[in-house]
Structures are given as structure tokens and as C-alpha cells.
């Protein structure tokens, strides 16, 4: 693949004394693994560019699963993520790395990713809505088709006040029992529209995407979630100290 492509680095690690191994999400080739030769050397002009959340143009080639990075240019500065939004971005990157197969084209998902990162960078409030929209988009691109608007048992439109149990590969069926796998019709309509007007619908969306993504992630926990759990107590402690000053 010798043409230029839009891309983002999802993750990088040292590869030999002077090179980097990159996990990259590209517009045309999907997720690819690239060796950036000499990128760690002092004279390399790629050091600053090959960072997560920096919009790139890349060229690469070679045979086998691991390709060689030929050229890379930063289209703009890295999108400004920090604190909660940084951990949210790392979560999105890890999610893509875990669930997408190598060299499978996901051009529409690439732009869903771009919009998510842009939303995180510009977020003045909670990053949760942007994360839930991306997770739902990802599930759709993976072929995870769910009808949120109709009861799988009767085919009737969902009712805002009724409760529905989610059953994998079937959909939502009316239920009298309320537990972690049940959602109201109001929740389901919010999931269908990807609009979350209140905390309740956001929490329901998070519950659903956790359930739906679990088969793709297997039993291995996400590292970014653990980092976020460690970050939150430290953030609260800093806020408490500031308030006590």
C-alpha cells in the first residue's frame, strides 16, 4: 500500500534501539501494524508526529503482517486531550486495537473515531455521550445489528414505560423482572437515536455497551479502565486539597 492515507497512531512501543512498533488505524486499510525505522533516533523528525491523537498522513508498504512505514506527516497538532478526556481517548484506542481485525477496511468507522476524538477534545462536560456514541457505532460496523425500537417477542414498538430484557442474538423481549440486563422503552429509544438527554439514559447506554462488547473483548480486562480507576481517586484527592487551601 504505497499511497498516502489518513491515519492515527493507536499505540506505540520501542522496537530495537532506534525504531518503533506502531498500531495504526488508517482510513483505507483499517488497523495495521507498522515498523517506524529510526523513529527513536535523535535526528528523527518523526518523534513528535507519531503520537496518539495526532492526525497523520502515512505511506507504508511491505509483505506480511508487519509493514514498514515509508513516510508520515502530521496534518495538524495533536488534539488536546487531558485528564478524563485523555483516559477516555486511550480507552477508545484500546477498544479499536482489541476488536478490529488487522487490515480490514473500516472507512466509516475511521470518521466515527475522528468525530469521537474531536468531541472529547472539545468537551466542556462529561465525555460519556461521545464514548457511548462511538461504542454503538463500533458495534454497528462489527455487524452487531440490534432493533432497539421493537419488541423481539411481539414485533410491537417499544413502550417508554415498559421493561425489556436483552437477549443476545435475539434482541429485547418484554420482561417483568428488573435487573442489569433490562432496559425501559425510554432507554431503548435513546440508544436508537444515540441521544442521551439525562444521566439515567447515559447509565443505561453504558450498561448495554458493556454487555454487547463483552464477547468481543473476552475475559481480558482493558488496561485503560484500570488506569482510569487509579486516576479518579487521585483526581478527587487533588480537588479536596484545593478546596481545603
Swiss-Prot record:
Gene Ontology BP annotations: DNA recombination; double-strand break repair
GO cellular component: bacterial nucleoid
SUPFAM superfamilies: ArfGap/RecO-like zinc finger, Nucleic acid-binding proteins
InterPro entries: ARFGAP/RecO, DNA_rep/recomb_RecO_N, NA-bd_OB-fold, RecO, RecO_C
Keywords: DNA damage, DNA recombination, DNA repair
Coiled coil regions in record: none
Function: Involved in DNA repair and RecF pathway recombination.
HAMAP family from the UniProt entry: RecO
Family note: Belongs to the RecO family.
Protein name: DNA repair protein RecO
Species annotation: Klebsiella pneumoniae subsp. pneumoniae (strain ATCC 700721 / MGH 78578)
Classification of source organism: Bacteria, Pseudomonadati, Pseudomonadota, Gammaproteobacteria, Enterobacterales
Name of the gene encoding the protein in the UniProt record: recO
Amino acid at each position: 500500500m504505497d499511497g498516502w492515507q489518513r491515519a492515527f497512531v493507536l499505540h506505540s512501543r520501542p522496537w530495537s534501539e532506534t525504531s518503533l512498533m506502531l498500531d495504526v488505524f488508517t482510513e483505507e486499510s483499517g488497523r495495521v501494524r507498522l515498523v517506524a525505522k529510526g523513529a527513536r533516533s535523535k535526528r528523527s523528525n518523526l518523534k513528535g508526529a507519531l503520537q496518539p491523537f495526532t492526525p497523520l498522513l502515512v505511506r507504508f508498504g511491505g509483505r506480511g503482517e508487519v509493514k514498514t512505514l515509508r513516510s508520515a506527516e502530521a496534518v495538524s497538532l495533536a488534539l488536546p486531550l487531558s485528564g478524563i478526556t485523555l483516559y477516555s481517548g486511550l480507552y477508545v484506542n484500546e477498544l479499536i486495537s482489541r476488536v478490529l481485525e488487522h487490515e480490514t477496511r473500516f472507512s466509516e468507522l475511521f470518521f466515527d473515531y475522528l468525530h469521537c476524538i474531536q468531541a472529547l477534545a472539545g468537551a466542556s462536560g462529561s465525555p460519556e455521550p461521545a464514548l457511548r456514541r462511538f461504542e454503538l457505532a463500533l458495534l454497528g460496523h462489527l455487524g452487531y445489528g440490534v432493533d432497539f425500537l421493537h419488541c423481539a417477542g411481539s414485533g410491537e414498538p417499544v413502550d417508554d414505560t415498559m421493561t425489556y430484557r436483552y437477549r443476545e442474538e435475539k434482541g429485547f423481549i418484554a420482561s417483568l423482572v428488573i435487573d442489569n440486563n433490562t432496559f425501559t422503552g425510554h432507554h431503548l429509544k435513546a440508544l436508537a437515536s444515540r441521544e442521551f438527554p439525562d444521566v439515567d439514559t447515559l447509565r443505561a447506554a453504558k450498561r448495554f455497551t458493556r454487555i454487547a462488547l463483552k464477547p468481543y473483548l473476552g475475559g481480558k480486562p482493558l488496561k485503560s479502565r484500570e488506569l482510569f480507576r487509579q486516576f479518579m481517586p487521585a483526581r478527587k484527592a487533588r480537588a479536596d486539597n484545593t478546596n481545603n487551601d
